[in-house]
Every structure is written in structure tokens, then in C-alpha cells.
Amino acid sequence: MIGIAAHICAAAPGPGARRYDPNMTPEERSHIDNGIWLCASCSVLIDRDQERFSVEVLRQMRRDHEASCRLGDNGSEAEGDLVAIGSDIVAVGHILGSGPAGMRVRLSHFVEGASRDLLALVHEFDRQLPEKRYILMNELGYGGLLDGAPNVERMGSAYEVQFRLQQTAPRRDATAEAVGMCAETGRMISGMDAYIQNFERALGMARGTWFARIRDGSDLSDLYWRYKDSPWFKRLAMMEMIRLSSIPSIKKCAHGPSTPFACVNRVNRVEVPTFELEGQRLNLRVEFDIEGLGPWSGELSVFISTPEQLAKGRASARIHHENIQRIEAESRNDLL
């Protein structure tokens, strides 16, 4: 079944805006609590019959469904876990097999994106940015860059995807000396304390807010505001950590490709004790497989930017980035 996201209360007034509530704030209209995932036929049906499908009826449908198949409480093969293919496709699926020809996964329904996005990625693979040609699998706790365009086959209401991964990026041995300066105290830190601070910084730097590497960064803040209080959040947060631990940074490094998390081989577990922020920080409990150390568990305190900070930071970074590109282009022209 292919899922389509629909609004319980319309996002804006106007012709065809079903169940619009003028008392809702813009944040409430765009919040995950105002969304419901349906099949293509039902999504059209509820938009045509607001008398039969009232706000309360739709909210009760959503509560009943979440109670019956809550992610994390149901480990059945039918439900599966999250799989991301590139930056625009997230689906629920599970691994069918792995061998010399590569791996094969079955996608049961889409959380973000749709079947047309999956097929477009296959046919336009060479036009995709290199850093977006990846696959992430929560079931295994890791991912990697695709070695070529995946093969996609429709199997009833599901899609089966076969792919090969490139050689994994080297990980840094966490037992080797690592030092840094504590952002809070200014004191020198080393070992896992330095790596933990690196994890927190990588997760807290929102994508598109640093002008020097505008395509780098984390999506955790965006995910927090979109999926706050939802059982989907911890799975999507885990997927984001898998991306940061498996996909090399865009930046060029003298020592070769390196991932933002540097020393993490696998992300085995992520828990969200509470969605409440303390000083704009979200506490997360994680279990990683660390190069040189093996299994490691600990807590991370990650800065979460507000929607206003994200918009302002991205606008400022974009201006600086464009100015730098303009200056560099002018310098090249002067040399000709």
C-alpha cells in the first residue's frame, strides 16, 4: 500500500479547503498532529466528504491505527523498519536478502516521497548529486553510497529494490588519541568525550546554515518540529544518525573520505526519553558500534534550532554563499 499524507484540517482557506479551522496557528496546521496517512483512494474520499469524515472521526482513525501498529512496539516482518533511498524517499520495508549480486529490500509503503520519486531516481541516477546517491537501513543500523542505479520491480502493492553499495568509508579508530576543546568550559577534552561532542555538533548543525558548506549539516531540527511527539521521530532520528555515520562528508579531507560521525560503524538503537527541550537541547539515548571499541551506549544533548532560527540561518548562509561564489567567479575571470 502506497501512503499519501493528507491534512486533517486544511492547511489554508479557499475553495476545496476541507475542515479548515481559522483558530489554528500556522504551526498547528503544519504539525504532524494535523496529518494522516492514507491510500490514494481514501485520501481523495475524505477530501470530498467532510460531513462523513469530520475532524474528530479522522483523529480517532489515526489514534486507532497508531495504537494497533505502533513503530517500535511491533517487530513483525510485515511492518518492517525504515529505509531511505536518497534524500527524498523514506519508506517502511525490510531486507529480503544479500549476496554477491548485492542486497534486496521490499518497500511496503512510503513515509516521504512516492513511487514516482523512486523510479525517477533510477532513471535520472547520473544526474543526482553524488552525496545523495545513498541508501540507509534502520534494520541493519548502517547504509552507504550506491554503486550504481538500483533495480526496481513492482511486486503487487510493494516495490522490491536491488542494489550494490560502494566500499564503505574508513572509520577512525576511537582508541587513537583524539583531543578537542569543550564548548561549555573551554577545557581540553579527549577520548570518547571528544567524540561525543563531535556527535552532538554534527547533529546540532542544521543543514544549509553554514555558508562554507551549504549542502552539509543535519536534518534533526527539521525532523523534531515535523514529528514532535510522534512515534516516527525516534526512527527518523536513528536514520539521520545512520546517514551521518555512513555517508562521507562533501568536504575534501587530506586523509581521504570521512563521515561526520568519524568513528561510528553502526547505529544500533536510539531512544527519546522526552520531547521536552532544556535550553533548546534534546536529550537522546544511543547505542553505537564504535571502531576500535565495539558496542558503546551513552547520552547525547543536541541543540535544536527553532523554525525561525532555521529560516534566518539558511537565508543568511545562502547570501554569504552566493557572495563567495560571485567573488570567486570574478577572480577567475580576472585571471583569464
Regions found by a protein language model. Give the residues of each.
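Domain-exit/linker segments immediately C-terminal to small folded modules
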Residues: 52-100
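Immediate N-terminus of the mature polypeptide
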Residues: 81-231, 256-336
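Short, non-transmembrane alpha-helical segments in secretory-pathway proteins
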Residues: 232-260
